[in-house]
Amino acid sequence: MQSADCIGLFRSLSVPNHVRPTKSKKLIFAYERNPKIMSQRNINLKLPHSWNECSTEQLELISRIMLEQIQRADRYHPFDMRNVKIACFFIFAGIEIVEGIDESKPLEEQHYTCRLTTPSRRNRIFSCKQQEEETFPIYLWQLNHWLTPKPKTDDRNSAEYLASGAGLLDWLDNERGAHLTRFPYPTLRLRNKRGLLRRKTDYEGPAQDMDGFSWQQYRFASDLMGQYTSLANNLVKMKQMGKFTPEQIAQQADSVDQARSMFLATIFNRRIDFIDTNTNVKVHDFHYDTRQFDTQAPIFRHFPDHQWQPILFWWTGMMHTLSRRYPHVFKVQKLDRTQRPSTPLEIYTATIATMQKYAGLTEDQVNNQSYSLVLEHLERLSKENEEMENIRKK
């Protein structure tokens, strides 16, 4: 990233006043190491250490940065996660770039002139002398050290170890690290786009670990996410090929949006009347309705991209968690090219049949069963079948 582009990126991303990271991480600035540069001054910067430590506003900021970088990418300037990390570092730390890099200086002396962002616009009005006193440099070599990934080896003499850094934002793209498992939108209020009154409706998002999800709600959400992913990937390919008309692109984009809205309508519950199975009493509260993926989908059409991305982060994190919790259920099977892959309906039907046979449950009972209990039962059956197969092979 060129210095001019870098400054433009940081200045174009405004930081909400209420966004503040959650954990302190003291960083040593160059002028602390060399008192000749400036008088010694300690500055404690706060950066989140994981996805789950990010507030909803911070997750949306990450999404906006990623979406902007994706839009700016082209054949000669591919998407680079390092640019995302640089922007996130300055925004999370509450640092504003006052002056860019002077490329005429030696590389080790090139730096950004920065200052800490103030909580209100009124406090930003200072005299030139005050501005000069509160500015500080961040050198390129410092930024490179802070954002270069940590080593994956303990060999201190290896090239990887010698080239490693502090890796302060490794969690942004570290597949082996902690994933987002906290749903970013516990509650959501949306306006009904249909009808004359256009009333707002309150929705409740998934609880921790999707507690309360039935097997049917989980399967619907999983299948709709698979459908969305397939349609979205096809849309990207269609745009890259350049052989489709604008009408065809628009039609595919509408299909993607429809699949996304149906997924959101499935995981967000609204207040409805239902019979509490524990008390057998009629209750009006947030509850799952088997038809909500269809009836509520129009309300979730054209859902903002910067809010959709955190939900994608969460779903990815949940699937990673479940795959580790139930490894046999989520085990990747080798594909047989002679056989056609199973459809979601076939998988759903096979699961119902298995539960009916081995657990003695009806289809409705399986659908209303907690998704985690069904996965536990399937995990146990899959493990037993694998052990039996290993015995037969011996």
Explain the meaning of each model-derived region.
Residues 3-394:
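An amphipathic, hydrophobic-aromatic interaction surface with interspersed Lys/Arg
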